[in-house]
Amino acid sequence: MGDFVEDFVRYLKEIAAKWREEWERARLHEADVDPNRPKFYVTAAFPYPNSPMHLGHSRTYSVTDAYARFKRMRGFNVLFPMGFHYTGTPIIAMSEKVKQGLQALRSLGEVKTILEEIWKIKVERNLSIGEAIKEYLRGAGREDLMDKTDSIEYLVLFYKVFEIPVEDLEKLTEPLSMANYFASITEEGMKELGYMIDWRRKFTTVDPDFQKFITWQFLKLYDLGYVEKGTHPVAWDPVYDTPVSQHDTKGDVEPEIEEYDVILFKLKDEDLYLPAATLRAETVFGVTNVWLNPEAEYEVVEVDGKRWVLSKKAAYKIKFQKDEVKSLGPIDPKKLLKKMVINPATEEEVPVLPARFVDPNVATGVVMSVPAHAPFDYVALKELEGDPEYSDIVKSIELVQVIRVPEEGLLVPQLVEKLGIRDTSDKKKLEEATREVYSKEYRKGRMLESVLERVKGDERLRAALKAFLGNDPVPDAREKTAKWLKLFGAGDVFYEIKNAPVYSRFGNEVVVKVLKDQWFLNYGDPQWKELARKALARMRIIPENFLKEFEDTIDWLQKRACARTRGLGTPLPWDKRWIIESLSDSTIYMAFYTVVNILRGASVEPEKLQPEVWDYIMLGKGNPKELEEKYGISAAVLEEARRSFDYWYPVDSRHSGKDLIRNHLTFFIFNHAAIFPEDKWPRQIVVNGFVNLEGKKMSKSLGNIIPITVAIRSFAPDIIRLVLLHSAELGSDADFRTEMVSRAISNLREIKSIVEKVKDYNGPRPANLTMLDAWYLSSFVKDVENVTNMMEDLKIREVTNVLYFILLNRTKEYLNALEAMGRGLDEVAKWVLRYTVERWVKMMTPFTPFFAEEMWHELGFNTFVVTEPWPVKDEELVNPLAEAAKEYVEKVIEDIKEIIKVAKIEKPKKVRIEVASPEQVKMLKMAVEFVNSGKSLREFMAEATKVFGKKEAKSLRQAFERATSLSESMRSVIARGEFDEKAVLEEFKRLIEEEVGSEVEIRRYEGGKKRPEPLRPAIYVE
């Protein structure tokens, strides 16, 4: 950055520090109940303090703060609170990693020196942090510490990226100490960014009073029947023996559980089963063979008394899903090839064949082959046909069609040929074909009755199956087939992590465990789902395109484990061995913000906050006098808390990242719908995308994370806010780029210089405005209206584009035109600019609040700008004629320049402009009237030729075509007969001369060879 840029950034940081101090001294961001003002309650997802806040976190909070400031200036009493989420395993896992990392480094030498050396290797060799650590360990001859790479990586990140002093790293080895340390850094970062947060309401989820609130919530859910104990598959950390959800995993990945149907194919003449895992049980009637991967490791495992052949990974996973599991040792898959197995559905014998496309890490590692309905199977068989060892077997295999799709033949052979798939190495095309086949068959397919003839046994069985399955839609047939196979012991289930591999915060790969005696929130309860749908239907989702994802999530959500055996948080009230997990204690905490400052201000002891107390505060049930007698809490305090909750609730706008739609945000809807009356249900959810850095995803391994403290020191708070808010539309991912930082700095400097031009001006409103002044003001008051409407819809990128780019460029254009026309900043122009700047500064407040505050005071005001009313559109200043005139003049200047360029005239002496005759103007006026009333060219010509004669048919047709292409403002002034081309050009003559570098003469057409059209003057350049 150049000196002037550095000076301006220093200035921005200085004014940010100054105004932060002033705001805090004035307690500007504190919000209390005010019955005389409408309220607006806005919340954003509270952060996990398991690391310092960085740029990626700050987008959600910057959007929320901009919206909160806007609503405050629109006359609302706005509350924006913040707390910290300590619940669950993330903080414990991180503190353990730090402890392990420090132990490893201390065994090598001095911690600081080693961290510096690792960073040097990373930078010099352009490696990831993890690769640099491994290089260092190899060089030190300490390969035995390779398994501690992940732990050391966090230390490098904290020390070099987050700039945490080495002496403070020890503080991070104890969970609560770490949480408090990072929470204080995050709070400071939020204050430095100017967020309008009422910090009196801060709490953590391990605070005793909050835990009493969560206890009340869960007792309510239990009484409603939404908390159940039972058996259910859950994502599981196999080392720490605890369920995991999104907040418990590395990268905040939600483990998705997928249920496979298992179909048991018994080896002929052997007590051994090949358990084929499938998502398409209905196709079992068309199985031609079973696949094993000859390169994979397999084991024999006794499952519920039967000997299953499973991949090594599946043999490990099955132990978490079944009670009766016994490992019987490895088995060579090659020894099973060519053997025959029995299809349990048809009792047909089919061969076991090799396929390297079978992934031993997915489900059982055994796949049934249905080539008529699976592109991979079809192509693999074609491939195997060329292998002499298997050629005869494959040639004897015939495709068996199980499903028919109306007006389609067998889809698989058609698609394989269409896509030009040659072999199984063409995975992308095979996956594309698979998706298309599965989709069409699922949506349109029906079971063929004829395929059920393959079932062995008596005719009665086949008849029963035809009645049971024949002609069924695929989804029904799938479910029925799986149930039928399970009924006689030939079917089972296997659960898999669909988006594997997913790792817990402790670094262990997550598996699926079928958990018994586990506590669940039953989001599958039909009554609860209906309430959630009702609540969602009444809400506004921004951006609207995310609504379907909410609807889909409500539909597929089922039971969800709500408690853990490990982690920070609130014990389950009726079974204190369990801790309520992080996505279950973060659904209605927004209600706690509304009263926490009152209860703590009155020094209410947490033990007194029994369920009856919360019933009164949150639901208005009970008598405060009786509660005072019973629990010793002042009735006045209880009544104040009740009034506060009743005033602030419901949440008017909830803000979060789009990754939380499928869990937290939907749980937020469910829990509010269950516990609170309808008038307290949330009104709006706002979702935003993520933040990239210079086009790349921010990653701890790459070390390309910018902590907020570092960003503020480098760029200043207002610049960070503006770049984050301007770089993408709400639902898209933002990109924090140095180029955009430079533009933001440059534009704020220019805006400051504009403000300084009129900071001391306080003259009266002029009696008359020129066309130029009127154009500028008319455009501006329209901006006010557009910006206001866009902010209501949170189209923040469009708003910042208007305020910091379009309006700035238009203002510069206005100032340049003033100079060109010889006016300079005269008294009228000063008033125009002052009028604009005052309102412009107000509208910048949500986005660059420190800069706006400084500019507001530069203009001579002594109030805080956020307490000022938002600008409103001044209808008196709307001037379509001035806008049309400026539009017209710009086009004329553009045409003149083009003529000069084409004619290659270096120094034009004179430009003559001839405008259309009055009669032609009348033609255009009539054409505009017809266009405005929706009439056709034919209707226009029929009437116009009566007025102007048939000889003018060509001109009339041109006039009509011209009328259809005009802007709305131009059409309106033409229709009113207000637009005089010659007068407009005369008024802007000096500007035109300055722009084209020549003397300009303007006159009306009085005859001649080149006849000008209305708004298309004839131009002659000498």
Curated annotation (Swiss-Prot):
The enzyme's E.C. designation: 6.1.1.4
UniProt: ATP binding residues: K700
InterPro entries: aa-tRNA-synth_Ia (IPR002300), Leu-tRNA-lgase_arc (IPR020791), Leu-tRNA-synth_Ia_arc/euk (IPR004493), M/V/L/I-tRNA-synth_anticd-bd (IPR013155), Methionyl/Leucyl_tRNA_Synth (IPR015413), Rossmann-like_a/b/a_fold (IPR014729), tRNAsynth_Ia_anticodon-bd (IPR009080), Val/Leu/Ile-tRNA-synth_edit (IPR009008)
Organism, scientific name: Ignicoccus hospitalis (strain KIN4/I / DSM 18386 / JCM 14125)
Protein name per UniProt: Leucine--tRNA ligase
Chain positions of motif 'HIGH' region: 47-57
Cellular component aspect of the GO annotation: cytoplasm
UniProt cross-references to NCBIfam families, sorted A to Z: leuS_arch, PRK12300.1
Residue interval(s) of motif 'KMSKS' region: 697-701
Pfam families for this protein: Anticodon_1, tRNA-synt_1, tRNA-synt_1g
Record-stated family: Belongs to the class-I aminoacyl-tRNA synthetase family.
Top-level lineage group: Archaea
Gene Ontology MF terms in the entry: aminoacyl-tRNA deacylase activity; ATP binding; leucine-tRNA ligase activity
CDD domains assigned to the protein according to its UniProt record, in alphabetical order: Anticodon_Ia_Leu_AEc
Annotated GO biological process: leucyl-tRNA aminoacylation
Presence of the UniProt keyword Phosphoprotein in the record: no
Keywords: Aminoacyl-tRNA synthetase, ATP-binding, Cytoplasm, Ligase, Nucleotide-binding, Protein biosynthesis
Entry-linked Gene3D superfamilies: Class I aminoacyl-tRNA synthetases (RS), HUPs, Isoleucyl-tRNA Synthetase, Domain 1, leucyl-tRNA synthetase, Valyl/Leucyl/Isoleucyl-tRNA synthetase, editing domain
Gene: leuS
Enzyme class: ligase
Catalyzed reactions: tRNA(Leu) + L-leucine + ATP = L-leucyl-tRNA(Leu) + AMP + diphosphate
Compartments, as annotated in UniProt: Cytoplasm
